Amino acid sequence: MRASGILMPVFSLPGPFGIGTLGKEAFAFVDFLADAKQTYWQILPIGPTGYGDSPYQSFSAFAGNPYFIDYRLLADVGLLTADEVPAARPVGPIDYGALYNERPVILKKAADRLLAASSPAYKAFCKEQAFWLEDYALFMAVKAEQGQAGLADWPDDLRCRKPEAIAAAKQRLAGAVDYYKAVQFFFYTQWNALKTYANSHGIQLVGDIPIYVSPDSSDLWTHPELFQTDGAVHLTSVAGCPPDAFAADGQLWGNPLYDWPRHEAEDFRWWKQRIKHATSIYDVVRIDHFRGFESYYSIPAGNKTAAGGHWEKGPDRAFIDAIHKALGEGGIIAEDLGYLTPEVKAMLAASGYPGMKIMQFAFDSREPGNYLPYTYPRNSVVYTGTHDNVTAEGWRQSASAEDVAYACRYLRCAPEDLTEAMICACLSCVSDMAVIPLADWLHLDAEARINTPSTQGANWQWRLTQPLTPALSAHIAELTALYHRVPGEEL
């Protein structure tokens, strides 16, 4: 089925609380998507973030981000008073430090009221999500007690989950544990309401899960045996990418690597739980760095760059077969960008999952792969760019003159029309699914870039300040229909 969607992080939505939330602006964006005849809203990972603010480095593979909870919705159900809802602030780049200081104070008031009410819905949520919720809440409570220290710096008995230390922590931190569980109830109550609304308006949510967990996460703390660690929950090897034309030293991500033989011995139980959870909150799931299931780049822990790493074999088709058997064969997008061997391509083909194509890469002379539209298979998802790319307009302004000239010759357009031409090339190509970042529909420049890989600083901060007008939704709808991406209206 030919269809299209828009990439827009939740945190980039407008709104009065310093960050995009699951409140009325999210519902209004669903309305905009429906008016624009879109099928998909693609977001970035929604887990709780810490130092660096990256949604790809979360404290949990299962929890939701407390920053996305909308205060107004809590007030609507009596969990906050009108006076406790902060005054609206101008929409601008996200100040994560301010959120870090403000959010717990306000959410604690709502949590106390929820816990005092003995809510049956809350109790049911805790029971249903117990497989991750209890450990996550205890992890966050201990982390707070330790002054927000990373897991690697915790006292040995807590880091290694010595039974006596864990029992004492559960008793000592019972109130904090209840708070973190209540916050997750708030998040998922609001998330589920948004998903129900989106689905009722013909919009499917495309989620995103990183292949790796964070080194400072409840997942590593709870299941160290599933990762490449020593006996004291210290990492022995970490994840990253080898050097290439975009990064001379490679990318040192620092995430824990999986102990794949242990996962396979357990029939990939943890991964099945993770993907099952993802498919319960999203309609489609993008798995980041999918090639890592075939082989992964391993860097000795402690290395300062990724240059000294090497490739190791992953579970390959054994993983794919286990996921197919447990969860079926659809609903997943495989992020397959970067260095792809014949073995990776064979694994992707065996999975049946669509891979990704990036229109910007088609005209980037540094990119060794061929991303020109004539090479795309139908079973693929095409983007002008992703969160890791500069906007299309920003690319036009910053790419080499030769690359821009080549793109204009190929797309038969003037330089000032290149963004629209890239969008049309995506929509017109044979890929079953086309996803355009909202910033490209608005022709925004590099100021709207979401992330620059391997950099610290102003990442994950962009927010929408431009109005989403009826004229824009009509324009998007017109092109979507022109290229036969309106479900039910295909040729």
Placement of each model-derived feature along the sequence:
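N-terminal regions that are enriched for targeting/export leaders
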Residues: M1-F11, F27
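Alpha-amylase-like alpha-glycosidases and glucanotransferases acting on alpha-linked glucans and related
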Residues: P9, D53-Q184, Y188, V213-V435, ...
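Short alpha-helical segments and helix-capping/turn motifs at coil-helix boundaries
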Residues: K24-D31, T189-Y197, W271-Q273, L418-M422
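Catalytic domains of carbohydrate-active enzymes, especially glycoside hydrolases
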Residues: K24-T49, S280-Y282
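Surface-exposed amphipathic alpha-helices with a cationic face
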Residues: A34, W191-N199, H324, L348-A349
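Outer-envelope exported proteins of Gram-negative bacteria
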Residues: L44, Q204-V206, P210, V284, ...
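Conserved, well-ordered alpha-helix/loop/beta-strand core segments that scaffold catalytic motifs
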Residues: Y180-V213
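Terminal-tail/helix-coil boundary detector
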Residues: W462, Q466-L491
